[in-house]
């Protein structure tokens, strides 16, 4: 295992725990401000749009000044966004908090670049797959922490997420290794041309996958409430189940599957699972499923 890998992994996992605290409760929280289902969708979209616009800039900045400072900046932005969301008294401040969080949400992509800096080429799929298991940890611990902290009031989970991001930023300053060194940018330029067909196809697949998962995040708590009468705790339990599956697949099975079938063999099966996930909510008609 490359030196510094587990520090990077822990930083990402803690960041995603904060994300997991917020996601299951955000829709219901927004309804307290009079938000409709459509407005909740726009709220999630505002985070994603800010991330879409700013993540490439953060990636380029990490090439110039290093991975570590950009990850720290992202974590500080996440803390600020979480505190603003928790302190919001009106809907526009809720949007402002999510936009701040999204604009600074480049920690995962920069962390993946840091792992690519550290890892030998043959080990990159396995190590980046293990980094993906941090999503699972976030969705296991985050909803549980969010559900418990919500007992103190609807604003409390966002403050908890903000405190966690602040602690994570301080720990990153102290512990996170710098993996990007002078000359690396020039050395790696041209490995894949920006307009290459391979990169375009990967970008399209990635966009569709992230869009599907974001739609699930944005709508599930409202869908579960209105169709099955799920409480916030019940919705959090579903996200916890998603997290457990992510930990098993990304943390253990992914490396073996890629070794046996290759990335091109694993991608279609993953897409098929997403399709089943999207279709399955239409099947049950009661709380029993």
For every predicted segment, state its role:
Residues 25-37, 219-234:
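Short amphipathic helix-loop junctions that connect adjacent transmembrane helices
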Residues 97-136:
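Cytoplasmic helix-loop-helix junction between adjacent transmembrane helices
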Residues 131-173:
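Helix-loop-helix hairpin linking two adjacent transmembrane segments in secondary transporters
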């Amino acid at each position: 295992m490359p030196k510094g890998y587990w520090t990077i992994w822990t930083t990402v996992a803690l960041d995603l725990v904060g994300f997991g605290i917020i996601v299951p409760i955000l829709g219901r929280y927004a309804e307290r401000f009079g938000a409709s289902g459509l407005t909740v969708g726009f709220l999630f979209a505002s985070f994603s749009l800010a991330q879409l616009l700013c993540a490439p800039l953060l990636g380029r900045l990490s090439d110039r000044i290093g991975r570590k400072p950009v990850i720290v900046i992202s974590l500080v932005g996440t803390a600020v966004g979480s505190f603003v969301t928790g302190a919001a008294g009106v809907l526009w401040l809720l949007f402002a908090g999510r936009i701040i969080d999204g604009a600074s949400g480049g920690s995962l992509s920069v962390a993946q670049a840091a792992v690519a800096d550290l890892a030998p080429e043959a080990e990159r799929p396995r190590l980046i797959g293990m980094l993906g298991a941090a999503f699972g940890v976030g969705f296991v611990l985050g909803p549980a922490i969010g559900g418990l902290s919500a007992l103190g009031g609807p604003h409390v989970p966002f403050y908890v997420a903000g405190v966690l991001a602040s602690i994570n930023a301080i720990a990153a300053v102290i512990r996170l290794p710098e993996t990007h060194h002078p000359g690396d940018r020039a050395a790696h330029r041209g490995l894949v041309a920006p307009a290459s067909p391979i990169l375009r196809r990967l970008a399209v697949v990635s966009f569709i996958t992230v869009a599907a998962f974001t739609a699930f995040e944005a709508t599930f708590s409202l869908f579960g409430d209105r169709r099955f009468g799920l409480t916030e705790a019940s919705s959090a339990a579903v996200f916890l189940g998603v997290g457990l599956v992510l930990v098993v697949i990304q943390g253990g099975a992914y490396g073996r599957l890629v070794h046996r079938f290759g990335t091109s063999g694993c991608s279609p099966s993953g897409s098929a699972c997403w399709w089943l996930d999207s279709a399955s909510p239409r099947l049950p008609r009661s709380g029993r499923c």
